[in-house]
Regions:
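Soluble non-cytosolic domains of exported or imported proteins
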Residues: 32, 154-158, 190
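Short pre-active-site segment immediately N-terminal to the catalytic Zn-binding motif
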Residues: 146-162
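Active-site recognition of the HExxH zinc-binding catalytic motif
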Residues: 34, 158-174
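Post-HExxH zinc-binding segment in Zn-dependent metallohydrolases
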Residues: 175, 182-284, 289, 293
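Juxtamembrane/interface and other helix-to-disorder boundary residues
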Residues: 1-95, 191-202, 254-304
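Auxiliary, metal-adjacent structural segments of Zn-dependent hydrolase domains
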Residues: 52-144
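Sec-exported extracytoplasmic/periplasmic mature domains
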Residues: 72-76, 168-176, 201, 205
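Short, solvent-exposed secondary-structure capping/transition elements
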Residues: 154-156, 171-183
């Protein structure tokens, strides 16, 4: 069955990109430890463009200041702003960027122009021949749309994962900006989509401090966009909350965790659980090694 690039392809997570192509280069940079690696490896250009939609279309451009505010709230070492329609950043001296910041810096500085055409919850997809009937679900690859209502409605992890996903997807596609509205092959969409999923996984690995997190299901249902699993057998889900009433048309991304024992947890609670278990494991290792004290919370305490 042919996959329309406007929609996500569950099989895409199985696609692999060639290790030395543009997409692989982007992913390698996104995995780098900080801004210096990004800056030294790529030409410094401002390549993410925030654009309005065309005349007569449903515009989300009025909410762009909220997008910039949200981006800054999630970027402790960066200051984001628009210069014209280009998204630019300034880094705080001697700061260490988070994984999200590192990925975003790499995307700003890669070679492709990445347009974000800001529509809203009322924007529709289709054509003049058959009509416009399909809502934009987060983003739309072929048209370059970004539903800013969907993006801003997400929780912090959901916002970050959706943003790096579609920007990575677009960055992996040759001459993306010039081809908006044209034809994209299933293979190139699948390649970018797979890299976008990996970019999401990187956000989760950094947040939970767990390198074992891997994708196991792509769009298994209308309200579950991704399912990741770690070596403990716990599942991390990016869920979609479908808006009702005044929020009809808003698809908000949020993240939760379902443990192997089927306990549903918030990301913060689950991260705290992992940290407690790591501390307990450290204490046990030190005890077995004959230590009389160990470090906990930055201070020395007697070993049990």
């Amino acid at each position: 069955m042919h996959v329309r690039p406007e929609h996500e392809a569950p099989a895409a997570s199985r696609e692999r990109a060639a290790p030395l192509d543009r997409a692989g280069r982007i992913l390698s940079l996104q995995r780098s430890a900080g801004n210096r690696a990004v800056m030294s490896a790529l030409r410094i250009d401002r390549k993410i463009e925030v654009r309005d939609v065309g005349r007569g279309e449903q515009s989300g451009f009025a909410r762009v200041p909220e997008f910039i505010e949200r981006l800054n709230g999630l970027s402790p070492s960066l200051n984001w702003k628009l210069e014209g329609r280009e998204l630019v950043f300034e880094q705080t001296p001697d700061s260490t960027p988070t994984n999200f910041e590192t990925q975003m810096m790499a995307l700003v500085n890669q070679e492709n122009v990445l347009p974000m055409r800001m529509t809203n919850r009322h924007g529709l997809l289709g054509d003049k021949a058959s009509g416009f009937h399909d809502s934009v679900d987060g983003d739309a690859f072929t048209s370059g749309y970004v539903d800013i209502d969907d993006l801003l409605a997400g929780d912090d992890l959901g916002f970050q994962m959706l943003l790096v996903h579609f920007l990575t997807e677009r960055a992996a596609t040759s001459n993306y900006a010039r081809r908006i509205g044209g034809n994209f092959s299933e293979a190139e969409f699948n390649r970018g989509h797979s890299l976008g999923i990996e970019a999401e996984a990187e956000i989760l690995r950094a947040f939970f401090g767990d390198p074992s997190i891997r994708i196991v299901a792509d769009s298994p249902s209308v309200t579950v966009r991704r399912v990741f699993r770690n070596s403990r057998g716990d599942r991390i889900r990016r869920r979609i909350r479908l808006g009702r009433g005044e929020e009809t048309g808003v698809n908000a991304s949020s993240v939760d965790v379902v443990t192997a024992g089927n306990i549903v947890m918030t990301p913060d609670d689950y991260r705290a659980l992992l940290e407690r278990e790591r501390t307990a494991a450290q204490v046990e290792r030190e005890r077995l090694g004959g230590a009389t004290e160990h470090r906990e919370g930055g201070r020395s305490v007697p070993a049990p």
